[in-house]
Structure formats: structure tokens, C-alpha cells
């Protein structure tokens, strides 16, 4: 009888411990799902370097990370992080990039006019391209353009091949871009005399698509 009572008490304990483990697993899974949906930004790590500092006791090593962050729709930023571990350096770079967000004027997936940017020894030339061309650019410049949401462009590096210089030269070029309305207002001319007809047509089409998407979202949200 003693053995039976001992066995009867052991079964509930086993079930309770198993249920507690399953519940703990469900809680962890739910928390991980929330963390995975934290950010919708595009992030590109362009370069990671190991640097050292000579001190009295020897050398201290750390890592630097050059990171590009953008929303893929005209907003982009560049960050440079430094830490003792690679993940921490990337995280610092992402945080700095988000603090330095700026808007890139785009029409139909390309830039508004040719522009050349310079930073230190880096020189980057950007030219608009017709739809379907794609992003014709090197690795460092491509990361900036893709995160900014540029789909068609011709880019060429005319100076240093250093990734940091190329990235900052590309950013300098993008910050020099102007909208056709700004140029027309400064010159006192109608916008048709400043921007090509094809560019204005592409802008009207993109605005129509954006307005249709907004109306569709409002309609779907209003339905019960």
C-alpha cells in the first residue's frame, strides 16, 4: 500500500513540473515575438574594423562599425559606432544613424538631378536613371542608396575607394539634392521650365499611386 501511495503522489508532481516548464516556454516565446517586431528600418553594415590602443599595460582592442539605416522611402542616416564587442559597436552605429536621419527628394524611384558629393578624399557622382535601370553603384554607395529607397540611379566613385569616404561623399551628394519646386521658386520660373516632362509625369504617377494606397487603407480601416 505504501508503494502505491508513493506512486500516486509522484504522478501529479510530474505533471505539475511539466506544465510549469511548458508555461515558461510559452512566456519566453511570446516575449521573443514582441522583440523581433521592434524595428521596420533597413540596416546595412558597410564596414567593421578592429582597432587597438597602446596603453601602459599593453594593447586594448576594440571594434568600429559603419552602419547605414533607412526606411526605404526617402529617409536615411549614417552612424559610426565603437565598442569592445562587434554587436555593441553595430548597436551604437544604428543609434547614431537614427539620430542623423535626413530626407532625400525622390521622383519615381530616382533622384531629381545629377549631383556630385565630396567628403575628405571621397568623390561620388550621382545621376538619375530611367525606370528599370536599377542601382548601378559600388558596395558602399549602394548600401546608402538602397536604404534611402532609390531604385534607379547611376553612381560612380571618382576619388578614394575607402568605404567611409565613399559613404560620406554619397551622403553629401544626397543632401545637395533639391526639389523642382525649390529651383523654380528661386529662379522665378514655372516648374515646367525647370524639370523635364518625363520627371513631372513620373511624379504625378507616384503621387496618384500614393493617394490610391491611402484611400484603400482608409476604406479597409473603416470596414467593420
Swiss-Prot record:
Renumbered to this chain, region (Disordered) spans: 1-38
Q: What InterPro entries does the entry give? A: Ribosomal_Su5_D2-typ_SF, Ribosomal_uS5, Ribosomal_uS5_bac-type, Ribosomal_uS5_C, Ribosomal_uS5_N, Ribosomal_uS5_N_CS, Ribsml_uS5_D2-typ_fold_subgr
Ranges of biased composition (kind: Basic and acidic residues) = 13-38
Question: Which SUPFAM superfamilies is this protein grouped with?
Answer: dsRNA-binding domain-like, Ribosomal protein S5 domain 2-like
The alphabetical list of record keywords is: Ribonucleoprotein, Ribosomal protein, RNA-binding, rRNA-binding
Single GO MF annotation: rRNA binding
Question: S5 DRBM domain: which residues?
Answer: 41-104
| Gene Ontology cellular-component terms listed | small ribosomal subunit
Query: Which GO BP terms, alphabetically?
Result: translation
- Pfam families named in the record: Ribosomal_S5, Ribosomal_S5_C
Residue stretches spanning the membrane: none
Superkingdom of source: Bacteria
**Function of the protein:** With S4 and S12 plays an important role in translational accuracy.
Question: What does its UniProt record remark on the domains?
Answer: The N-terminal domain interacts with the head of the 30S subunit; the C-terminal domain interacts with the body and contacts protein S4. The interaction surface between S4 and S5 is involved in control of translational fidelity.
Annotated HAMAP family: Ribosomal_uS5_B
Q: Which family does it belong to?
A: Belongs to the universal ribosomal protein uS5 family.
> Self-association or partners: how does it assemble?
Part of the 30S ribosomal subunit. Contacts proteins S4 and S8.
Record-given protein name: Small ribosomal subunit protein uS5
Q: What is the organism field in this record?
A: Mycobacterium marinum (strain ATCC BAA-535 / M)
Gene of origin?
rpsE
